[in-house]
From Swiss-Prot:
More about this protein: Polymorphic variants of this gene are not associated with specific anosmia for trimethylamine.
GO cellular component: plasma membrane
Residue ranges of the TM segments: 35-55, 71-91, 110-130, 155-175, 205-225, 254-274, 285-307
Glycosylation sites: 21
GO molecular function: G protein-coupled receptor activity; trace-amine receptor activity; trimethylamine receptor activity
UniProt topology in membrane: Multi-pass membrane protein
Function of the protein: Olfactory receptor specific for trimethylamine, a trace amine. Also activated at lower level by dimethylethylamine. Trimethylamine is a bacterial metabolite found in some animal odors, and to humans it is a repulsive odor associated with bad breath and spoiled food. Trimethylamine-binding causes a conformation change that triggers signaling via G(s)-class of G alpha proteins (GNAL or GNAS).
Family: Belongs to the G-protein coupled receptor 1 family.
S-S pairs: 24-188, 99-192
Annotated spans, Extracellular Loop 2 (ECL2): 176-189
Protein name in the entry: Trace amine-associated receptor 5
Topological domain ranges for the Extracellular compartment: 1-34, 92-109, 176-204, 275-284
Stretches of the chain found on the membrane's Cytoplasmic side: 56-70, 131-154, 226-253, 308-337
Amino acid sequence: MRAVFIQGAEEHPAAFCYQVNGSCPRTVHTLGIQLVIYLACAAGMLIIVLGNVFVAFAVSYFKALHTPTNFLLLSLALADMFLGLLVLPLSTIRSVESCWFFGDFLCRLHTYLDTLFCLTSIFHLCFISIDRHCAICDPLLYPSKFTVRVALRYILAGWGVPAAYTSLFLYTDVVETRLSQWLEEMPCVGSCQLLLNKFWGWLNFPLFFVPCLIMISLYVKIFVVATRQAQQITTLSKSLAGAAKHERKAAKTLGIAVGIYLLCWLPFTIDTMVDSLLHFITPPLVFDIFIWFAYFNSACNPIIYVFSYQWFRKALKLTLSQKVFSPQTRTVDLYQE
């Protein structure tokens, strides 16, 4: 992901980030506007953190939810939760103040965590699509093919590959020594802008779009197979019909999650690629909106689960009613109608 950052003032630069030569201009908002933005961002962070904390708790606590698919959902929820806890607070200050006040070390760390958690979410959604494809298109072999051990391998890859990739570009001199012709110097003092160059923008394009293409192609096949299964469901036994219905509903729910992900991330991803060709002419305010639209995706998954998964609503009800503290609650069958 391109490291973002308000480089200058959008309308009336009333001040500078620092009282030094080469400082970035700063847009000073009225107190009312600042308060509204801070409250909106705080509400978004609260939804992201609390929603994903509950998903992680439910899957961890209730034994009925200890399935390969749900372990992937748990890992996805942790990535979104950490984004809300560790990245968005500083992103909020950067967006409101239009400057970065936390130094080079935190700038690099913030960019690392931002990129890590976002790429981890993308990889997990791709792996969940593979899981659903296997469950719908090859249901007889699915229990033996997609085991908990396989899910744990996917989780390890979903965290390990983004961590290694991001570390390579942010904490080594590989880019600077071998691709120095692509790099541009920091435009001004007070921006958190790392590796802002054409190579960085184009390299991130396939990292976002290849998983997207995989997810779309898998869900197209899932839709075709699920439609055919729905037409044949009357010939199945009651137990097999119920299992097939459950798998199709899970695939539909996760398909909605993938669709919302695409809507949230497409503006930012396309702009990152196109903007690198046009010498980064996107206004800072517009680019910041694209970034927050992408962040919004982390709040969507728990909301989708509330409206789509009966087990999620049951787990939420048990938790809020404090029945979760009963020893028998952990073994409740949340999938029972």
